[in-house]
Amino acid sequence: MDKLIIKGGKKLSGEVTVSGSKNASLPVFVSTILAPAEHEFSNVPFLRDINTTIKVMEQLGAKIEGNGNVVRIDTRGIDKHEATYDLVKTMRASVLVLGPLLSRFGIARVSLPGGCAIGARPINLHLKGLAAMGADITLSHGYVEAKAKQLKGARINFDVSTVGGTEHLMMAAATAKGETILENAAREPEIVDLANVLIKMGARIDGAGTDTIRIDGVKELGPVTHRMMPDRIEAGTFMIAAAITGGDVKIRNMQLEHLDALVFKLQDAGVEIINKDNVVRVKGPKKVRSVNIKTRPYPGFPTDMQAQFMALMCLADGASVISENIFENRFMHVSELMRFGADITTEGNAATVKGVKKLSGAPVMATDLRASASLILAGLASDNTTEISRIYHLDRGYEFIEKKLAGLGADIERVQE
């Protein structure tokens, strides 16, 4: 198993290029099930979650070729309608194949993601939506089975904003009979990217990026060529890496408008951000100011940037309150940050971070994807050496992050434990 060794205290400088979006690529790949044809996607990141999605689709019968960051998917040979537990258990997003398989074959059987309590997770919103469109859904032995000769358009109002649910039902509705209206839909840029792909295939979709999406079902969809949008969470992570080290970094291939809430808070903290000629320059101050954040659905502050922002606030002047309003149990990085000498207390969904003068490198353990990133950031800004174990989480969502940081002057290397 690999670990990262970081010798902190170096100001980052230079240029870095953001990879394609993981969270956009996963549903886009799944959407090709709807269109028996050859498809081509560029700017695809090389990540573990991408490989898992590819394995799921190959298990269904798709032929997939990769060449660098270009992936070609031939879905004409898909002849199975079941996604088994051995693959789905490793990634919750795999459940998105249910709707497209149901649309194509009239039947689909997909394992529930590992540790997924139906009532507590938004997957119940996916199933309620498919049922509203006429699907007969049964749960047994850890599998969801759905049947429908023809999905029919419906008006669906989500109880809470759900990115996966919005993506799932938008795909299912693309070839349903009649009009589907999704109300209280999620507004994330990744949903807009998926809608653009479906529209290129021939779907009729209006309103993606707003809270009301209208889909007028068509009989069939065709092949598509598409360049994946940049990963806004990776971009945000590099912005904080520049800020926390007092560095000066230029970031290429990012869309700053997708990170308005983060940009506002970073500027509030004293970070200088300059957007010129599609290159974003981030200059960190000698000492950041404390800033309160509350995670919200897009366009609010992204929950996927909460852990990284907390790492920054560990060195701020003053105290900040960080409220997590999207997910439960998303403070698992707190105990590890405290090993660096951070002063953090939690109560319910709020963490109070009192800035300290310095952090000291420590052996720490990654608990999830974004928590892993927060530990790297803390390590970059720490005295001494930091060792981060269980970094396989990182490989789910960051493409070659240690190489990119090393290119900015960080003393960081991946070694085998």
Curated annotation (Swiss-Prot):
Pfam families: EPSP_synthase (PF00275). UDP-N-acetyl-alpha-D-glucosamine binds at residues 92, 304, 326. Pathway: Cell wall biogenesis; peptidoglycan biosynthesis. The active site is at residue 116. It is an enzyme of class 2 (transferase). The modification 2-(S-cysteinyl)pyruvic acid O-phosphothioketal is found at residue 116. Its EC number is 2.5.1.7. Keywords: Cell cycle, Cell division, Cell shape, Cell wall biogenesis/degradation, Cytoplasm, Peptidoglycan synthesis, Pyruvate, Transferase. SUPFAM superfamilies: EPT/RTPC-like. The keyword rRNA-binding does not apply. It catalyses: phosphoenolpyruvate + UDP-N-acetyl-alpha-D-glucosamine = UDP-N-acetyl-3-O-(1-carboxyvinyl)-alpha-D-glucosamine + phosphate. It is found in: Cytoplasm. It comes from the Bacteria. Phosphoenolpyruvate binds at residues 22-23. Its main location: cytoplasm. GO terms for biological process: cell division; cell wall organization; peptidoglycan biosynthetic process; regulation of cell shape; UDP-N-acetylgalactosamine biosynthetic process. GO terms for molecular function: UDP-N-acetylglucosamine 1-carboxyvinyltransferase activity. Belongs to the EPSP synthase family. MurA subfamily. Cell wall formation. Adds enolpyruvyl to UDP-N-acetylglucosamine. This is UDP-N-acetylglucosamine 1-carboxyvinyltransferase. It comes from Geotalea daltonii (strain DSM 22248 / JCM 15807 / FRC-32). The lineage of its organism: Bacteria, Pseudomonadati, Thermodesulfobacteriota, Desulfuromonadia, Geobacterales.
